[in-house]
Amino acid sequence: MSEKVESKGLADAARDHLAAELARLRQRRDRLEVEVKNDRGMIGDHGDAAEAIQRADELAILGDRINELDRRLRTGPTPWSGSETLPGGTEVTLRFPDGEVVTMHVISVVEETPVGREAETLTARSPLGQALAGHQPGDTVTYSTPQGPNQVQLLAVKLPS
């Protein structure tokens, strides 16, 4: 599936990056579709069922991201207007309650996490990722953790080009 897509308003490097990510996600989706089809009618324990549900959920998330990238390649970027999630490729700088300042890279799919950079990677649909959406630098943002609510100060947001 290598179709040439004309994009308005995207630099060549950004378009190439998005096209490469789109191809990678489509390959992952194709593999997952086979696994999900094989899951149907499977008899197994609760762990197998949980893995099947996780694969189906990931397939839905991949579909959303593929549609977003396809749209972005066809029409160009849309201004960030505080949607429900930060776009993949966004860089956020946060100050945590202990004073630590961390720059994190937003990803859409967990498999995009660079090896060795797990601590600086933030998934867009995580509690913190969703809480940051719609906020501006200078805002204090509250998000849920297993230990209860936590807060960070959003220092900077750099959207993907």
UniProtKB/Swiss-Prot annotation:
GO terms for molecular function: DNA binding; RNA polymerase binding. InterPro entries: GreA/GreB_C_sf (IPR036953), Tscrpt_elong_fac_GreA/B_C (IPR001437), Tscrpt_elong_fac_GreA/B_fam (IPR023459). GO terms for biological process: DNA-templated transcription elongation; regulation of DNA-templated transcription elongation. Pfam families: GreA_GreB. This is Uncharacterized protein Mb3817. It comes from Mycobacterium bovis (strain ATCC BAA-935 / AF2122/97). The lineage of its organism: Bacteria, Bacillati, Actinomycetota, Actinomycetes, Mycobacteriales.
